Design a protein with these regions (language model features):
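Active-site regions of enzymes building and remodeling cell-envelope glycoconjugates
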Residues: 16-22, 73, 110-120, 194-205, ...
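A donor-sugar binding/catalytic signature common to diverse glycosyltransferases
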Residues: 55-62, 67, 77, 208-249
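Catalytic donor nucleotide-activated moiety binding site of glycosyltransferases and closely related
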Residues: 5-6, 15-27, 150-152, 172-204
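Structural motif
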Residues: 54-55, 97, 147, 183, ...
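Active-site and donor-binding regions of nucleotide-sugar-utilizing enzymes
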Residues: 5-109
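Donor nucleotide-activated moiety binding/catalytic core segment of transferases
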Residues: 40-44, 189-225
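N-terminal subdomain of nucleotide-sugar transferases
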Residues: 1-2
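A nucleotide-sugar donor-handling region in carbohydrate enzymes
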Residues: 99-164
C-alpha cells in the first residue's frame, strides 16, 4: 500500500495498523502536480521492483497505472468521478479494467465494467457497518441533542480548479442560522477560518461514519461524505458546482 499524505489518510492507516509507504504531500498547482506525478511514479516503481506484485489495484491512480504498464502487470482501477477529466486521462490509457457504478455518466469503452451500487456501499452496507452510540459521549452530546455537520474541502484536486463551494460570508451566515436550532460541527479538509475554530470537529477519523449516522443533517462541499450520508440514511445537502452520476441517482432515489 502506498498513500499520499492528504487529510486523514495516514492517520486512518496508522489507527488500523495497516502498513504503508507514504508518497508525501501532493501539490495544488498544475505544474506542482506534474512534478509530484513524476516523483510518485519513481517511488512506486522502486517499491514495485522490490515487492514484485502480480496485480495493481487502485482508486483511479495514475501512479499505479503508469508503473503497472512499465512492468507489464495488469492494473484494475475504480472511479466514480466523471468530472475528473485530467485524472481520467492520466490513468485510463494504462489501465486494463476500470470499474464504475452503473449510474456513472461517462463511457470508457471495452475496458469499462459497471456494477450496481455506489462505491460507499463497499464499507457502509449493513453487513460491514454498525453505528456506535459511544461517539456521542466523545463529543459531549446527549442522545437527543441535534447536531449538523458542515464539510469544507481543500479545493486542491485537479478537477476542482475553477470551482468553489461556500463563500466565507455565506458560511458564517449559514452557521448562525443553524446554531439557533442545532449544534454545529465543522469537518474541514484544509485550514479552518480563525473566527470559526470553535466549531471544528475534533475526532478520531475512524469515528466519522458513526458521527455522520447520528447527525440530524449534513451540508458539505465533499461528494464522498454526501454519498456516505445517503447510504447511512442521514439527510444531506451537497454544495458544489460539480456533480456526479452517483449523487444524481441518490437524489432521484430520495436517499
Amino acid at each position: 500500500i502506498t498513500a499520499r499524505e492528504k487529510d486523514v489518510t495516514h492517520q486512518l492507516l496508522d489507527n488500523y495498523d495497516i502498513p504503508y509507504t507514504s508518497r508525501g504531500k501532493g501539490k495544488s498547482s498544475l505544474i506542482g502536480k506534474f512534478f509530484y506525478l513524476i516523483k510518485a511514479d519513481l517511488l512506486l516503481l522502486r517499491l514495485a521492483k522490490i515487492f514484485n506484485p502480480d496485480l495493481f489495484l487502485s482508486f483511479a491512480s495514475p501512479y499505479a497505472s503508469h508503473v503497472s504498464s512499465i512492468l507489464g502487470k495488469p492494473h484494475i482501477a475504480f472511479t466514480d468521478t466523471e468530472h475528473a477529466k485530467l485524472g481520467i486521462l492520466s490513468f485510463l490509457p494504462f489501465t486494463d479494467v476500470v470499474f464504475t457504478p452503473e449510474v456513472y455518466k461517462s463511457d470508457h469503452g471495452n475496458k469499462h465494467l459497471r456494477f450496481s451500487g455506489y462505491m460507499e456501499q463497499c464499507y457502509l452496507q449493513n453487513n460491514y457497518f454498525s453505528p456506535n452510540n459511544n461517539v456521542l459521549k466523545k463529543l459531549n452530546l446527549k442522545k437527543n441533542d441535534k447536531f449538523v455537520i458542515i464539510r469544507l474541502v481543500s479545493w486542491e484536486a485537479s478537477h476542482d480548479i475553477g470551482h468553489r463551494g461556500f463563500s466565507q460570508g455565506y458560511l458564517e451566515r449559514l452557521i448562525g442560522f443553524i446554531e439557533q436550532k442545532a449544534i454545529v460541527f465543522l469537518s474541514v479538509e484544509g485550514v479552518v477560518p480563525t473566527n470559526l475554530e470553535k466549531y471544528k470537529l475534533f475526532i478520531d477519523p475512524t469515528d466519522i461514519h458513526h458521527i455522520l449516522y447520528h447527525a440530524e443533517l449534513f451540508i458539505g462541499e465533499g461528494a464522498t461524505m454526501a454519498s456516505e450520508c445517503a447510504i447511512l440514511g442521514t439527510p444531506s445537502i451537497y454544495v458544489n458546482t460539480l456533480s456526479a452520476g452517483s449523487l444524481e441517482d441518490q437524489a432521484k432515489q430520495n436517499l
